[in-house]
Amino acid sequence: MNRSKTFGKIRKRLEEAKNKWARLCKVEYSYNESARLATDALLDGGVEDYEKVLNEEGEVDFLSGDEIQYIMKNIKEPMYSNDNQTEGECGSAANGNKSECFYPMNSDKSEPVSTLHNWSAEEKPYLKDKSSATVYFQTDKTNNVRETIRRCIHRTTQVLAILMDEFTDAEIFCDVLEAANKRNIFVYLLLDANKLHLFTQMCEKLQVRDLHMKNISVRSVTGDVYCAKSGKKFAGQIHEKFIISDWRCVLSGSYSFTWLSGQVHRNFLYKFSGVVVELFDEEFRHLYGSSKPVMGLKSPAPMAPVLRREDSGVSVMTDSTPESVNTTSEPFSSTSTASISNDSQRPKSPESTDPVLASPPRSPVRSPLQRMNSLHGYPSLISPPPQSNYQPNYYQRNYAPDSPSSFFNNNANIYRSFRMRQDDFSTPRFNQGWSLFSRSTMT
């Protein structure tokens, strides 16, 4: 009987588990060197070298056929040329990068640089709600998983953060577009890089372009990276799936944004609120900091402050489905005094009297997460900004000069993006005036 001189870690445990009379040993959770050597051989030489190392180490074949195929398909060559690699170096790049070897002390705790606002204990919105957890299963027809996700999107009033492995559901995509374009909700979408092409194909079939996604930031992210000593490496996939609504409610589970997941696949969904949302908040910050922007899809436009009433906010946990508090009245949708603004009240630019020729002042370039921080990080406004600082080509709320500014100071942390209406310059103006505290009169 031919037996290997040495037993690998997995093979040794397997033989002991199959032997009824073998003594029960303590389970080891330490690092498996034989598995690392075999994986490095697979990256460097292919399947034959992988099997050769397994025989030499006396280890079992621990990778399935699909896993081997995935690794071979996603191998990336090192950044440097093989001619520049000197003998004895362990992945040292010619461009001055550090070693490509895996050092747990340096890589396990490494955090990407993030520009997110760090909330204090008083500012964290998820601390305002009571901690709760609810589970939904696909078999529960009264609480459908797909409809629960769609209701969460419709009840969001400020920010929607989505981490998803696959996004091809056109109906859910319409919900996201409606939230961003109609209710001025800022959407931050992280997708798995390996399945990003499915999302872009859906956008092409639906004829969705950059101009339709001005309030949506789409970025791609990968899983952890395995790197061999030779410098070859491959990245994993994103199997985490969750939605953060207004940083107060989280939906997480096995559900993917696909038609099959909503119709035939078995899935479950968790709904969290309270302190546990902080863990999802930290994970999203970490992944967003290591993500890459998707080519062809722009980030949300710069935001300007819009004041709102204290009692106008709506919690995500309620059963009603109102519009976002960031949404202003559409000037062409109604002839009421609350939705029509006078041309004389529209802000004018001191440099030019022609609104078409006047160029809006440039705002500083800020990342999407910096703009998202402004939802929670800015102090209350003392008074409305002067009209001379407004951009003349955009619609936003006008402030009555005699309105008490202290009425808004307690809740002024909502920021929305400017909107340009090019068709307004060819449309006759309404002459009926509008005031913030005006009341309709009966005639």
Swiss-Prot record:
<dbReference type="InterPro" id="IPR012461">
    <property type="entry name" value="SACK1"/>
</dbReference>
<dbReference type="GO" id="GO:0007173">
    <property type="term" value="P:epidermal growth factor receptor signaling pathway"/>
</dbReference>
<protein>
    <recommendedName>
        <fullName>Protein FAM83A</fullName>
    </recommendedName>
</protein>
<dbReference type="GO" id="GO:0019901">
    <property type="term" value="F:protein kinase binding"/>
</dbReference>
<dbReference type="GO" id="GO:0008283">
    <property type="term" value="P:cell population proliferation"/>
</dbReference>
<feature type="region of interest" description="Disordered">
    <location>
        <begin position="311"/>
        <end position="403"/>
    </location>
</feature>
<feature type="compositionally biased region" description="Low complexity">
    <location>
        <begin position="388"/>
        <end position="399"/>
    </location>
</feature>
<keyword id="KW-0963">Cytoplasm</keyword>
<feature type="compositionally biased region" description="Low complexity">
    <location>
        <begin position="327"/>
        <end position="344"/>
    </location>
</feature>
<dbReference type="Pfam" id="PF07894">
    <property type="entry name" value="SACK1"/>
</dbReference>
<comment type="function">
    <text>May function in the epidermal growth factor receptor/EGFR signaling pathway.</text>
</comment>
<feature type="compositionally biased region" description="Polar residues">
    <location>
        <begin position="315"/>
        <end position="326"/>
    </location>
</feature>
<dbReference type="InterPro" id="IPR050944">
    <property type="entry name" value="FAM83"/>
</dbReference>
<dbReference type="GO" id="GO:0005737">
    <property type="term" value="C:cytoplasm"/>
</dbReference>
<comment type="similarity">
    <text>Belongs to the FAM83 family.</text>
</comment>
